[in-house]
C-alpha cells in the first residue's frame, strides 16, 4: 500500500474552492486548521467540521466528487446523515469529516468564534485545543503544549489594538466619558 501524502495548504485551497462553489457550511479544524493559521506542524489529512444537516451533507458529497473523490453509496449515506466521524480515503488526499468534534458544543457556536484566514474558515485555536484535549488521544495530548504556545503567540499578533476609554465612548457617541 502506498503512503498518502501529508497535508498541504494547497489541498485546503482545493476544498475551500469546491465547498464555496457548492455552498458547504464548514470550518477547518484539528491540526490542519492550526497549520492554516501558521502552526509549524504536519498532519496526514484535512480535518473538517461541517454543519450537520442533510442538505449540507449533500453539498459536501457533490463538492468532494467535483475534486476527484470517489464517494460510494455507503459513504455518501454516512456524510448525508452527519455521522459523528467520517474518514474519506478515496480521493487525491485524505479527509476527515468531524460532525461532532470532542470538546465543542455546537457548530453555530464554533462558527461564531471561528477565524477567516484568507479563503479558509478555520475554527478558533481555543476550540481546536479544546477538541484535542477532550479527545484524550495520546498523539493529541502530546501536541497540546506546542499548540498552547502557538495560540498565545497567535493571539498576541492578532489582538485588537488597545483603545482608551475616551476612544470607546466616542465610538458609541458618548462624549461625556472624559
Give the positions of each predicted feature.
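Compositionally biased terminal segments of proteins
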Residues: 1-178
Amino acid at each position: 500500500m502506498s503512503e498518502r501524502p501529508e497535508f498541504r495548504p494547497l489541498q485546503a485551497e482545493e476544498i475551500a474552492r469546491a465547498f464555496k462553489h457548492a455552498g458547504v457550511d464548514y470550518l477547518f479544524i484539528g491540526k490542519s486548521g492550526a497549520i492554516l493559521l501558521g502552526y509549524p506542524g504536519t498532519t496526514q489529512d484535512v480535518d473538517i467540521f461541517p454543519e450537520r444537516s442533510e442538505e449540507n451533507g449533500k453539498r459536501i458529497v457533490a463538492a468532494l466528487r467535483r475534486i476527484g473523490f470517489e464517494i460510494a453509496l455507503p459513504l455518501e449515506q454516512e456524510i448525508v446523515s452527519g455521522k459523528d466521524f467520517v474518514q474519506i480515503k478515496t480521493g487525491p488526499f485524505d479527509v476527515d469529516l468531524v460532525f461532532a468534534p470532542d470538546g465543542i458544543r455546537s457548530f453555530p457556536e464554533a462558527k461564531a468564534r471561528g477565524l477567516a484566514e484568507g479563503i479558509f474558515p478555520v475554527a478558533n485555536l481555543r476550540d481546536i485545543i479544546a477538541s484535542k484535549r477532550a479527545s484524550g488521544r495520546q498523539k493529541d495530548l502530546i501536541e497540546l503544549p506546542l499548540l498552547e504556545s502557538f495560540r498565545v503567540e497567535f493571539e498576541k499578533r492578532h489582538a485588537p489594538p488597545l483603545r482608551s476609554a475616551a476612544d470607546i465612548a466616542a465610538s458609541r457617541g458618548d462624549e461625556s466619558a472624559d
